[in-house]
Amino acid sequence: MSCLVLPLVSVGNIPQLSIDWLLNSQANEWEYLEALDSKYLVEFVGPLDRPEDGSDSLYKDADMKYSSALEVFYNKKRGLFAIQQRTPLVSVNYLNNFIVEIILPFLSKYNISEICIWDSLYAMEDENGVIVRPQEVYSLGEFYFDDEAELLSNLHLNDQESMVNNWLHFTPTSFQDKISVDQPIFKILFQILNASQRPKALRSIKYCSCLANEGDNSLDSQQFLQWIISQKVIKNAPPIVKFVRPISWQGAYGMADARDKFVDLYN
């Protein structure tokens, strides 16, 4: 069984930061696999990143000098693929093209059986009322392809509920119980479920999301990853003994926790 982790560019870049934690904290298990076509993304070229603690580079066996906007890393030991998307789409209107032309062929090429999508949302932007437990921070929704009849019926949207749907089955402790057509996850699911040549090996889709605000979300992303691992969302994902940042975070993310320094300000 192989799984692809796909982070969405969303609030606070939490999914991307969580991928950074995952890769750099277990750098001995991950390696650079390939760069995907980034024609629908904002252009990006940067230096090759590496773990801050001096561990082996993720690019150690790759003959390259620069990193690009859309790269795939592979954990052969655990059958895991992880995409790191470093820039957003040029326009949200290209999301459908991105899924159909870039992601679906990748799923087929490597016979991916499960895709795990990571996302982050603003709690205050819930026009369609999908957030039903705002006291919770995380959500986990799942879709399985076991029943083709159920799949076909799920593609039909009730006219009275056209702004939301229940394609995903959320856990009882999730902050949301449906998805909105305004969410990128809706378009992603729609394109995968309606694909004329759906990847044959694909058996399940999992959607992990968290509520957040913009800022230095390095701690939020670490806790998000910890939650994903604790829930065994990705069955083969091992616990992280020591969290390691990438060197690219220096001066940008991951400042020491300064919350205690503001105590006197509010007393």
From Swiss-Prot:
Involved in 20S proteasome assembly. Required for maximal proteasome activity. Affects the chymotrypsin-like activity of the proteasome. Can be degraded by the proteasome. Involved in the endoplasmic reticulum-associated degradation (ERAD). Component of the 20S proteasome chaperone. Forms a heterodimer with PBA1 that binds to proteasome precursors. PANTHER family: PROTEASOME ASSEMBLY CHAPERONE 2. This is Proteasome assembly chaperone 2. Its main location: cytoplasm. Disulfide bonds: none annotated. One of its GO terms (cellular component) is nucleus. The lineage of its organism: Eukaryota, Fungi, Dikarya, Ascomycota, Saccharomycotina. Pfam families: PAC2. Belongs to the PSMG2 family. Coiled coil: none annotated. Present with 2940 molecules/cell in log phase SD medium. Deletion induces the unfolded protein response (UPR). It is found in: Cytoplasm. GO terms for biological process: proteasome assembly. Keywords: Chaperone, Cytoplasm. The keyword Cytoplasm applies. It comes from the Eukaryota.
